[in-house]
Regions:
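Conserved short alpha-helical segments that host acidic/polar catalytic motifs at enzyme active sites
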Residues: 1-237
């Protein structure tokens, strides 16, 4: 597959939904993680991302406008020892619980399926970074319906060996749509990762659709020292 420019990918899609990027910095020094949230409804847009321990959680920007917390309030990122979990829903907790019990990322997600938000049946996307011996490996997954059919759940898993300057990008929606928003199709997209954490963060945030973007989390993990750098950007301030 052709390696894509993440800036162009985002700028050319008004509504990819929620997205995960995992890869390795161009200088080979850092594991790179990004997670973004977009929204169309008042309930979806009424959110901010805040730090929680080594990870993050979402919370309502204006609690009075929170109509349904079930699919919008969750912990997208949690850390367990040398493993960082990133997902677009409460399956973060499922993966954390399974890994803590010595079970696998795949086994955890096989207990879950797409979100129950008919007619979209939004995919659940998940990633895992595992640090080891000055390097790392990573995985991505998507749990989706077959063309919006809730009786036909599908699950896909992808395993990667990191390459300098390369990441993989998966998002919930192929593009905007009505009455049903079409789910992401195919493999995670190979994308270039350029610059330091601030350059990377700016590249993502400035190219997400201005009306629909809600929050962005980025993290660079130094593979030699384990030092973590994190950036969080919220539209609501």
């Amino acid at each position: 597959m052709e390696t894509l420019d993440i800036k162009k990918e985002l700028a050319g899609n008004a509504y990819p939904g929620r997205g995960i990027v995992i890869g390795k910095s161009a200088d080979g020094v850092h594991a790179v993680i990004a997670y973004f949230i977009m929204g169309r409804s008042v309930n979806s847009r009424n959110r901010v991302v805040v730090e929680q321990g080594d990870g993050i959680r979402t919370e309502a920007f204006d609690p009075a406008k929170l109509s349904d917390p079930s699919l919008v309030i969750y912990a997208p990122v949690r850390v367990l020892a040398n493993k960082t979990i990133v997902t677009n829903g409460d399956q973060t907790d499922t993966v954390f619980t399974y890994l803590k019990a010595g079970k696998s990322f795949k086994k955890a997600l096989k207990t879950r399926k797409f979100e129950p938000d008919a007619p979209n049946f939004t995919p659940r996307i998940s990633g895992l970074v595992k640090l080891k011996d000055g390097d790392f490996t990573y995985k991505l997954s998507i749990l989706k319906s077959c063309e919006g059919n809730p009786d036909a759940p599908q699950s896909f898993f992808f395993d990667y060996t990191p390459v300098d300057g390369l990441g993989h990008f998966i998002h919930t929606y192929k593009c905007d749509g009505a009455p049903r928003i079409p789910s992401f199709e195919g493999e995670p997209k190979p994308v270039k990762i350029e610059g330091d954490i601030d350059t990377f963060t700016n590249d993502l945030w400035t190219n997400l659709n201005e009306d629909n973007k809600v929050s962005l989390f980025t993290r660079f993990i130094n593979l030699k020292t384990g030092k973590i750098e994190t950036r969080i950007v919220n539209k609501n301030k």
